[in-house]
Amino acid sequence: MPIATPEVYNEMLDRAKAGKFAYPAINVTSSQTLHAALRGFAEAESDGIIQISTGGAEFLGGQHKKDMVTGAVALAEFAHVVAAKYDITVALHTDHCPKDKLDGYVRPLLAISAERVAKGQNPLFQSHMWDGSAETLNDNLAIAQELLAQAVAAKIILEVEITPTGGEEDGVTHEINDELYTTVNDVVRTAEALGLGEKGRYLLAASFGNVHGVYKPGNVVLKPQLLRELQDAIGAQYGKNDPFDFVFHGGSGSSAEEIATALENGVVKMNLDTDTQYAFTRPVADHMFRNYDGVLKVDGEVGKKNTYDPRTWGKLAEAGMAARVLEAAQSLRSAGNRLK
């Protein structure tokens, strides 16, 4: 299917919220990880979200220049071509972008989509994320207001992170502590600044103990029930049921119960990166260990071309990551819910 239009993306999010499921949002760093994500969605009969972080975009831009916009645009254009061959619908999204990278990433990408829309085309990306969690809430929301207006003009949805997610994501680091929980006051101020849809649709990455990366059980206390408190507080104030479209960050390693509670409380998008990175790399490591004397030229031998051919181990990597995407779609209840 073609990449989602703005109208289709809104329909996807509406369906997820009404059906209490969420889309896996899979970080990709290459054409191969893109195909792995698309394959996983297709095998799950699930629509989904493909996302590119600042680090991923820089990597995609090549190690010679390391240009984030070049990398993001190149993969997005590639995705528009190859996604049409899969019988599912995906939206393209850019992941965490802090203040010091806005001018080199999100703002130029917004401008590119605005130009496309002015010509009667669809935007290149369907949503962008502004991560102002390292800023004061006042500064965070002021920048969010500016970006939301630009996003609306380009027919794009903005994702906003108002409070920190723990751990490290592309150089943005937050300690694991009590600051990892969004308060009612935080969302009151967010609703006052950004509205509840009348100024433009946005996705809200609220914090309920989330942590990026890998962590041992017991080190992190997730409280997805907090999302219900936030929904109800603002809903009562504005007379709207479940006013927020929530995003679940730092979702790798979450329990089935934690995910289910988050879905019941308005999560429509859940990010996966750490788990899919491992799922992609693990089969490659296995192949290298099992075939080291073919991959390497050992003891004067010449190795075996079919063992070090990137296509050989690349197919294993794609299959491994696709299986993890399929598993995510099942956990998030999006499996079998593709648009038809």
Predicted regions and their residues:
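Short, conserved beta-strand segments within well-ordered enzyme catalytic domains
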Residues: 25-27, 49-51, 91-93
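Glycine-rich beta-to-alpha transition loops that act as phosphate-gripper elements at the mouths
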Residues: 28, 92-98, 244-254
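Alpha/beta enzyme core
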Residues: 7-15, 31-87, 99-242, 256-261, ...
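N-terminal amphipathic alpha-helix/helix-capping segment at the start of soluble metabolic enzymes
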Residues: 1-24
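Extended, intrinsically disordered, low-complexity segments
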Residues: 290-340
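Catalytic-face loop-and-helix region of soluble metabolic enzyme cores
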Residues: 83-84, 211, 216, 226, ...
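Glycine- and other small-residue-rich loops at beta-strand/loop junctions that grip anionic moieties
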Residues: 26-27, 133, 176-179, 216-219, ...
